Amino acid sequence: MRNDLERFFNPRSIAIIGASQDFITISGQPLKHLQSHGYQGKLYAVNPRYPEVAGVKCYPAIKDLPETPDLVLVLVNAARVADILRQCGAKGVPYVIIFSSGFSEMGGEGVRMQRELAEIAQKHDIGVIGPNCQGMMNVADGVFAGFGSVFFTDYEPGSVSMVSQSGGFGFSVMNLSSKDGGLPFRQMVTTGNEIGVSTLDFMDYFIRDPQTTLIGAYLEGARDAHRLPEIGRKALAAGKPILMWKVGNTEQGQKAAASHTANLGGA
């Protein structure tokens, strides 16, 4: 369980590993979105191919950064992620979002690769979000750390915070709620295959967040499902309703959920 998620949602510095000068690609979008939405912290690009990306100095490797970033975004192919995560551990990075796919959701070798990531994260006490996720938003503070059409949109900050194991579902709910439903969002985070920081970790944080009044969650499965009653009691005591979509209750739904996040620990 992570108790310092304020640092994740409000990072003082962010490093983008694999940052690209092609701003339409997945690896090129996050840096531009952070800039265009007014993120006020320090930005670092890491890619040995470029001297700079979007006006931001580019460093050849994580070890070359002048400071330890609060948050690292990993946008490289699956085969390179384990080495990148080790470098983050050596640098003392507290939080890493792994966007890369090609892990347990693919089966076979991907299962072993994902297990290796979990072991590295545990060894170095890194709060990993992902892999195979779409990123996160902290609307009020301009932390638009992700990719996809919703990240090109400006949103008014609100008091709804949501965590979703599906990026497509979560950001669709956020967009519809904020634009058409009259319930603007404060924070949105996607956890993908969820090897580290869990859906329930984020729900627990939202309960403690004084600016969140309504909590949303999309859950395909949870390895820490035993915490749900406690989470419910905390939310009730705090007067914060939880709206949860729990999928995978039928055999067909379980297969669909497994193919997406490889999360077989149904709650």
Report the location of each language-model feature.
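Catalytic-core regions of core metabolic enzymes
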Residues: 1-267
